[in-house]
Amino acid sequence: MTTPMKIAITGVSGRMGRMLVDTIDTSDAVTLSAALERPGHDWIGRDLGLALGGTERGVLVSDDIDSALADSEAVIDFTSPAATIRFAQAAARVGAIHVIGTTGMTEQEIAQIDAQAAGAVIVRAGNMSLGVNLLVQLTKRVAAALDEDFDIEVIESHHNQKVDAPSGTALMLGEAAAEGRGVSLDAVSDRGRDGLTGARQKGDIGFVSVRGGDIVGEHDVLFAAQGERITLRHVASDRSVFARGALKAALWARHRAPGAYDMLDVLGLKDG
């Protein structure tokens, strides 16, 4: 029987950190080996189970990245761009798999992270769910099939605590639409309309971000032409879909060669 994979969780006090702990607890394939939080956090040094309001579980919350990863096969990371860069460097030092769900990164930050893939396995995705990654592929195919008479808009909705916009998933969808049309997203992206903007530019890919309440995540890709519209839609009602996807990515990466991968690789959806 395969030994359960030892997983470290970063940002363990946050929404996704807690969901990952709960999801690990329901799986026989993985086990929680380390719980990490930022230096100075109230949970540092406390038993994770007690910090979560339950019983002791024998895992102390730590801010010592190297020690935590030395006893882990993989680290799952839904934190901030700056923290993710540090985790990528630490994971590469010890050869741990790094599964990244952090969003809001610049191209320079992504390059810093991907540079660590020379000696480590990195799986990075703006969204870990099966449904969203299928939506990405569908978006690319529909965009390729339709001409510029169809305007493309990506509309995303999230809870009122989300700090980046557009969401990482929205950008994935925008990239897919641009790739389908054979253009660069940077050249056609329209992320802000206010005041007298003038008519919509033909070929642009627009983004709309909604923030409110406790919305987990909703994404629509609208293809609108004269007399007809097509909408591709995904709704996440529970963060467990992201946690399950992240664990699937870690298990998939267990015996992979060093390199930078994404969820399309994990799910076998990559073209070619």
UniProtKB/Swiss-Prot annotation:
Signal peptide: none
Subcellular location: Cytoplasm
Keywords: Amino-acid biosynthesis, Cytoplasm, Diaminopimelate biosynthesis, Lysine biosynthesis, NAD, NADP, Oxidoreductase
Binding site for (S)-2,3,4,5-tetrahydrodipicolinate: H159, G168, T169
Any Pfam family: DapB_N
One GO-annotated biological process of the protein: diaminopimelate biosynthetic process
Recorded catalytic activity of this chain's protein: (S)-2,3,4,5-tetrahydrodipicolinate + NAD(+) + H2O = (2S,4S)-4-hydroxy-2,3,4,5-tetrahydrodipicolinate + NADH + H(+); (S)-2,3,4,5-tetrahydrodipicolinate + NADP(+) + H2O = (2S,4S)-4-hydroxy-2,3,4,5-tetrahydrodipicolinate + NADPH + H(+)
Pathway: Amino-acid biosynthesis; L-lysine biosynthesis via DAP pathway; (S)-tetrahydrodipicolinate from L-aspartate: step 4/4
Chief site of localization: cytoplasm
EC number: 1.17.1.8
GO CC, alphabetical: cytosol
Catalytic site positions: H158, K162
MF GO annotations: 4-hydroxy-tetrahydrodipicolinate reductase; NAD binding; NADP binding; oxidoreductase activity, acting on CH or CH2 groups, NAD or NADP as acceptor
Top EC category: oxidoreductase
Binding-site residues for NADP(+), renumbered to this chain: R38
The organism's place on the tree of life at top rank: Bacteria
InterPro entries for this protein: DapB_C, DapB_N, DapB_N_CS, DHDPR_bac, NAD(P)-bd_dom_sf
Binding site for NAD(+): G11, V12, S13, G14, R15, M16, E37, G101, T102, T103, A125, G126, N127, M128
Similarity section: Belongs to the DapB family.
Role this protein plays: Catalyzes the conversion of 4-hydroxy-tetrahydrodipicolinate (HTPA) to tetrahydrodipicolinate.
Name of the molecule in the record: 4-hydroxy-tetrahydrodipicolinate reductase
Record organism: Roseobacter denitrificans (strain ATCC 33942 / OCh 114)
